[in-house]
């Protein structure tokens, strides 16, 4: 697929343009320079054409810290992968020395470049005051737009598609195939190693990795093919405790999208720092996954730093503190060393199979009948609880419908017993919750 990179100095509106092109608030937008710390990949669909667009983290003129230095380093490396570069400048303020330096870098890359003047709401003022100096960059006629207001975006899209097709790229697409992918969200506390794990799986340094908590603030999606199956991995921002996230804080948007990532995933990989153990926040995150009925795999990352006794202690801790997802496979990994990744992928495909598993109705009813005979429901007062019929009515997660005389007579511990007997006698349903819906028999 053709790849279009959005490049430019900080705060010229690259993320706003990205969001306008792909639709939705995918990259975080704020007024402070450098607020987009990750590459964010999206796909543009327009008039039966499609291409990939990448919101880069910005070419920093003089890196102020390790994060900015690495962003510049990786962004420069990414230029070689792009088929077309959108060089975004500020159409209100005109060119700066940083713009000139970036222009020189882009010329040296020998890539196709479209010059985009953003924030142009007043075309007459732009034409008189800014346009003449833009021609001096040597990238041809600039395209004035306002990403915030959607002005001239159609003209830009036409130019992008024409340029790519003239270069020999085939942009026709079949959108119905897009939803076939297994979707996997990588979640967990900040600095647990989610980005390193993500990179080990996809085999690309696309998600910025440092030792500073919270460097992954945008969702970064990567689709790879494993044994012929397309799998989309969602690398999310570390989930903060609610008390630490202010409504106006830019981290707020990341937390909200982390929850969104769980919502749109089929399976979640919960990454826990093995050197720190299971925290209350890990329990809360696991609870979010369980309540939303998503498949789950628990990963103790950084386990290369542990001995066998410590690993056994973590397993005991898992049984105590994450008992409500005791069906989750547990994998010990070291993303930086690369071990445990094959086992993780094996578990991923196992869970992918289980979330779609269906129990034959006859087998299910036979098991429920035997269970109610050996462990009859208590009921309340003088009223007995009765189960007349059972059937699995859905998958992702497996949903069992029980036709009963009165739903109020069935306690959660009793339903938990039904789930357990299904796992023990029919299938373990590794990595997936089993939901039970009670319906009164008419």
Swiss-Prot record:
One of its GO terms (biological process) is ribosome biogenesis. GTP 1 binds at residues 8-15, 55-59, 118-121. It holds the Pfam family KH_dom-like. The keyword Membrane does not apply. The keyword GTP-binding applies. Residues 2-168, 182-356 form the EngA-type G domain. GTP 2 binds at residues 188-195, 235-239, 301-304. Residues 357-442 form the KH-like domain. Keywords: GTP-binding, Nucleotide-binding, Repeat, Ribosome biogenesis. Coiled coil: none annotated. CDD domains: EngA1 (cd01894), EngA2 (cd01895). One of its GO terms (molecular function) is ribosome binding. GTPase that plays an essential role in the late steps of ribosome biogenesis. Associates with the 50S ribosomal subunit. Belongs to the TRAFAC class TrmE-Era-EngA-EngB-Septin-like GTPase superfamily. EngA (Der) GTPase family. HAMAP family: GTPase_Der. This is GTPase Der.
């Amino acid at each position: 697929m053709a790849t279009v990179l959005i490049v430019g100095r900080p705060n010229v509106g690259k993320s706003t343009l990205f969001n306008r092109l792909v639709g939705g608030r995918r990259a975080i937008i704020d007024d402070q320079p450098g607020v987009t710390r990750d590459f964010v990949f999206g796909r543009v669909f327009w008039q039966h054409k499609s291409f990939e667009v990448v919101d880069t983290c910005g070419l920093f003129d003089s890196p102020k810290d390790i994060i900015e230095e690495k962003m510049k380093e990786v962004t420069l490396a990414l230029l070689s992968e792009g088929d077309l570069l959108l060089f975004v400048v500020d159409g209100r303020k005109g060119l700066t020395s940083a713009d000139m330096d970036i222009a020189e870098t882009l010329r040296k890359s020998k890539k196709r470049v479209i010059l985009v003047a953003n924030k142009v709401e007043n075309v007459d003022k732009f034409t008189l005051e800014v346009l003449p100096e833009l021609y001096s960059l040597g990238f041809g006629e600039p395209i004035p737009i306002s990403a915030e207001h959607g002005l001239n975006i159609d003209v830009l899209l036409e130019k992008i598609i024409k340029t790519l097709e003239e270069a020999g790229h085939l942009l026709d697409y079949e959108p119905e195939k897009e939803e076939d992918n297994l979707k996997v969200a990588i979640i967990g506390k900040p600095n647990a190693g989610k980005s390193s794990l993500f990179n080990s799986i996809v085999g690309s340094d696309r998600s910025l990795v440092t030792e500073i908590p919270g460097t992954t603030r945008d969702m970064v999606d990567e689709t790879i093919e494993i044994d012929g199956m397309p799998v989309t991995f969602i690398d999310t921002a570390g989930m903060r405790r609610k008390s630490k996230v202010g409504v106006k804080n830019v981290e707020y948007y990341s937390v909200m999208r982390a929850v969104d990532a769980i919502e749109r995933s089929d399976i979640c990989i919960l990454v826990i720092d093995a050197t720190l153990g299971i925290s209350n926040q890990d329990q809360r995150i696991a609870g979010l996954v369980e309540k939303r009925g998503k498949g789950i795999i628990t990963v103790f990352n950084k386990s290369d730093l542990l001995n066998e006794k410590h690993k056994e202690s973590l397993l005991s801790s898992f049984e105590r503190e994450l008992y409500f997802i005791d069906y989750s496979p547990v994998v010990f990994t070291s993303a930086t060393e690369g071990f445990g990744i094959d086992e993780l992928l094996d578990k991923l495909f196992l869970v992918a199979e289980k979330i779609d598993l269906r129990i034959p109705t006859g087998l299910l009813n036979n098991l429920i009948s035997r269970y109610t005979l050996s462990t009859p429901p208590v009921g309340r007062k003088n009223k007995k609880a009765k189960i007349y019929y059972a059937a699995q009515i859905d998958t992702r997660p497996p949903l069992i419908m029980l036709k009963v005389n009165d739903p109020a007579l069935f306690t959660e511990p009793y339903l938990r017993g039904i789930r357990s007997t299904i796992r023990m006698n029919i299938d373990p349903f590794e990595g997936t919750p089993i939901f039970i819906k009670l319906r009164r028999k008419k």
